[in-house]
C-alpha cells in the first residue's frame, strides 16, 4: 500500500496523518463539485441513460478498489444463470492493454487472456462457464452486443455505480464492512468516488467482510443500508473454497496450507486482507510481496519472487485467483508445483432472501427468452 493509500484508509489519521493529507484538501473540493454536478445532470435527465433491452443489475461501490465487488458479481451472475437466464457481464476491463470493446467470453469459454481482457473479466470468464463476459469503456455498446449478438436476457454491470450512462434495474453497492469509507474524504484526499449520501440511489447494500466488522459498526451499517434503500443489507464473508496450483488445477485441500511456511504474492488494492486469509488458514507467511492493484506481473518479477521464497525456506508462493490470471502463463505453468492459488467466494451470512427479492423485482419486466443466436461471436 502506498503512502497516499495509507492516508486514505486510516479512519482516524491523527495529527500527522491530517497534516500529510492537508495538501489534498484543495483538490478534493473541485472533485466533489464535479461529482455533484454530474449526478445532478443524470438525476434531471439532462444526461441520458440508455436502456439495454434486458434487465441490468449493477454491482458497484463508493470507494476505489478492494470492497469485494468481484465475488459479489460472481454470486449475482451465478444466481441469475441458475434461474435459466442467459447472462452477460459487462466490465470496464481494468488492467487490459486494449481499450476497445471486446468479448472476453461468449459463454462457451474464455476467448481472451487477462492482458487483453483485464484481470476481472478473465477471472469471471474462467469461473462462470455459460456466462458471456464483455469488456470495454462504453458499457452501453457492450450491452447492445450482449443482447443483440449473444442473446443475453440479463446483464450484470461490473463496477457500475458511477457509470450512469447505462440504465439499470437494480443498483447493488458493495461496502467493506470492516472499513467502508476510509478517512471519509473524496478523491484525491480520500478513497471515495462519491459521498455516502449517494447510497440513496442504491437498491441494495452488500456488506462484504461482515465477519471482520465490530458488532457496533455492523449494526450502524445495517441502519445506514435500511435508511438508504428500504431494505436490510446482504452480508457476506470472503470464504476460501479451493486450492489450485500455478496452472490453475485443483491442488488438494486448503488444509495443506496449515503449518506451511509460504510467501504471499499479490497485486490488490488492499493486500492485508489476503494476508489475514492465509493466516486464518494456518499458513506461516514468511515473505510478502505486494504490487499495485491490477498489476500485470512480468516473468522476471515472478522468477524473483520464487527465488526469494526459496531463500526464505518457503514451501510455496501463494497468490489469489485474481492475481493468478495476470501471471505469465507459461512460467506459472512451468512452476506449477511451486505456486499455490487460493480461490475465495462470497459466502452469504445474512440477507439471501433480501437478495433474491431484489433480483425478482429487477427481473419483473424481463422480456421473454429468445432463441440463442445461431453462431457464436468471436
Swiss-Prot record:
Q: Which GO terms describe its cellular component?
A: plasma membrane
- Which domain of life, per UniProt? Bacteria
A GO molecular-function annotation: ATP binding
Gene Ontology biological process terms in this record:
lipid A biosynthetic process; lipopolysaccharide core region biosynthetic process
| Pathway info | Glycolipid biosynthesis; lipid IV(A) biosynthesis; lipid IV(A) from (3R)-3-hydroxytetradecanoyl-[acyl-carrier-protein] and UDP-N-acetyl-alpha-D-glucosamine: step 6/6
Catalytic reaction list: a lipid A disaccharide + ATP = a lipid IVA + ADP + H(+)
Q: What class of enzyme is it?
A: transferase
Entry EC number(s): 2.7.1.130
Q: Name one Pfam family in it.
A: LpxK
Q: Which InterPro entries match?
A: LpxK, P-loop_NTPase
**Annotated binding of ATP, by residue:** 63-70
Q: Does the keyword ATP-binding apply?
A: yes
Alphabetically sorted, this entry's keywords are:
ATP-binding, Kinase, Lipid A biosynthesis, Lipid biosynthesis, Lipid metabolism, Nucleotide-binding, Transferase
Does the keyword Kinase feature in the UniProt annotation? yes
What function does the entry list? Answer: Transfers the gamma-phosphate of ATP to the 4'-position of a tetraacyldisaccharide 1-phosphate intermediate (termed DS-1-P) to form tetraacyldisaccharide 1,4'-bis-phosphate (lipid IVA).
| HAMAP family the record matches | LpxK (MF_00409)
The similarity annotation says: Belongs to the LpxK family.
Q: What is this protein called?
A: Tetraacyldisaccharide 4'-kinase
Q: Which species expresses this protein natively? A: Anaeromyxobacter sp. (strain K)
Its taxonomic path starts at: Bacteria, Pseudomonadati, Myxococcota, Myxococcia, Myxococcales
Q: Which gene encodes it?
A: lpxK
Amino acid at each position: 500500500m502506498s503512502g497516499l493509500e495509507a492516508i486514505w484508509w486510516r479512519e482516524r489519521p491523527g495529527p500527522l496523518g491530517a497534516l500529510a493529507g492537508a495538501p489534498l484538501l484543495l483538490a478534493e473540493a473541485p472533485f466533489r463539485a464535479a461529482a455533484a454536478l454530474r449526478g445532478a445532470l443524470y438525476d434531471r435527465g439532462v444526461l441520458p441513460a440508455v436502456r439495454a433491452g434486458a434487465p441490468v443489475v449493477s454491482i458497484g461501490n463508493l470507494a476505489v478498489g478492494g470492497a469485494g465487488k468481484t465475488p459479489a458479481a460472481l454470486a449475482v451472475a451465478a444466481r441469475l444463470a441458475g434461474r435459466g437466464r442467459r447472462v452477460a457481464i459487462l466490465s470496464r476491463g481494468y488492467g487490459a492493454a486494449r481499450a476497445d470493446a471486446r468479448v472476453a467470453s461468449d459463454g462457451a469459454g474464455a476467448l481472451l487472456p487477462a492482458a487483453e481482457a483485464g484481470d476481472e473479466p478473465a477471472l469471471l470468464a474462467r469461473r462462470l462457464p455459460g456466462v458471456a463476459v464483455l469488456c470495454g469503456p462504453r458499457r452501453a455498446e457492450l450491452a447492445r452486443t450482449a443482447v443483440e449478438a449473444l442473446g443475453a436476457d440479463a446483464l450484470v454491470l461490473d463496477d457500475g455505480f458511477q457509470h450512469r450512462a447505462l440504465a439499470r434495474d437494480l443498483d447493488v453497492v458493495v461496502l467493506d464492512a470492516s472499513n467502508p469509507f476510509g478517512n471519509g474524504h473524496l478523491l484525491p484526499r480520500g478513497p471515495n468516488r462519491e459521498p455516502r449520501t449517494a447510497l440513496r440511489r442504491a437498491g441494495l447494500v452488500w456488506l462484504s467482510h461482515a465477519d471482520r466488522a465490530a458488532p457496533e459498526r455492523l449494526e450502524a451499517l445495517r441502519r445506514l443500508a435500511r435508511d438508504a434503500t428500504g431494505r436490510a443489507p446482504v452480508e457476506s464473508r470472503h470464504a476460501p473454497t479451493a486450492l489450485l496450483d500455478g496452472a490453475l488445477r485443483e491442488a488438494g485441500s486448503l488444509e495443506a496450507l496449515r503449518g506451511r511456511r509460504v510467501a504471499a504474492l499479490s497485486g490488490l488494492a488492499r493486500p492485508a486482507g489476503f494476508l489475514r486469509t492465509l493466516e486464518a488458514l494456518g499458513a506461516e507467511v514468511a515473505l510478502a510481496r505486494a504490487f499495485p492493484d491490477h498489476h500485470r506481473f512480468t516473468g522476471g518479477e515472478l522468477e524473483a519472487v520464487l527465488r526469494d521464497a526459496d531463500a526464505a525456506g518457503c514451501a510455496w508462493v501463494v497468490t489469489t485467483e485474481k492475481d493468478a490470471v495476470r501471471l505469465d502463463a507459461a512460467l506459472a505453468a512451468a512452476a506449477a508445483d511451486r505456486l499455490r492459488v487460493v480461490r475465495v467466494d462470497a459466502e452469504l451470512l445474512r440477507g439471501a432472501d433480501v437478495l433474491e427479492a431484489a433480483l425478482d423485482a429487477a427481473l419483473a419486466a424481463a422480456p421473454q427468452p429468445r432463441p440463442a443466436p445461431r453462431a457464436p461471436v468471436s
